[in-house]
């Protein structure tokens, strides 16, 4: 799927990639979700399916935070307070830790909830607000949302397919 350029395309990309993601996540046996055998987000690391969901949940929560802060006229620390763009591996580790106490089913439910919040925030905005002007450096709000929702969902789908193939797990 190409990079979304409109609100409708963004919503479609999120829905398509998230639906596939949820299907895959629900196909994985629960006893396999904590196995650190998937290529990690930081070079040379491995992570579990739980970590992958925590990563997505963390980034989706940041999207909600960014948009909410912006709507209130508050300054936004991109990507997150205390982190720079060259520290995304550390931020991934923070996300894994932040959600480590949640069960796998709770992680998926929380991801669904925060994704729904993002969809609501998108629906409350016009194409012009989402794509009409730069929001963070040269990137529009819509592009920043895509960078942290539909694109990572698609990436996660690829990671899960590769991991499942290596583990002889059917994601059908």
Tell me what each language-model feature is:
Residues 1-24:
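Extreme N-terminal tail/first-helix region
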Residues 27-43:
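Short secondary-structure junction/hinge motifs that connect adjacent elements
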């Amino acid at each position: 799927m190409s990079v979304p350029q409109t609100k409708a395309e963004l919503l479609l990309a999120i829905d398509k990639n998230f639906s596939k993601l949820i299907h895959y996540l629900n196909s994985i046996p629960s006893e396999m979700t904590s196995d650190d055998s998937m290529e990690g987000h930081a070079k040379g690391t491995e992570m579990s399916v739980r970590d992958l969901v925590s990563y997505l949940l963390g980034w989706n929560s940041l999207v909600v935070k960014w948009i909410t802060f912006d709507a209130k006229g508050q300054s936004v620390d991109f990507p997150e307070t205390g982190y720079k763009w060259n520290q995304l591996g550390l931020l991934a580790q923070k996300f894994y830790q932040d959600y480590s106490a949640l069960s796998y089913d709770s992680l998926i439910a929380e991801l669904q909830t925060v994704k729904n919040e993002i969809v609501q925030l998108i629906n409350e905005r016009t194409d012009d607000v989402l794509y009409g002007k730069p929001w963070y450096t040269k990137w529009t709000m819509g592009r920043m949302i895509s960078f942290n929702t539909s694109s990572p969902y698609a990436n996660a789908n690829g990671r899960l397919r590769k991991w499942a193939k290596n583990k002889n797990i059917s994601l059908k």
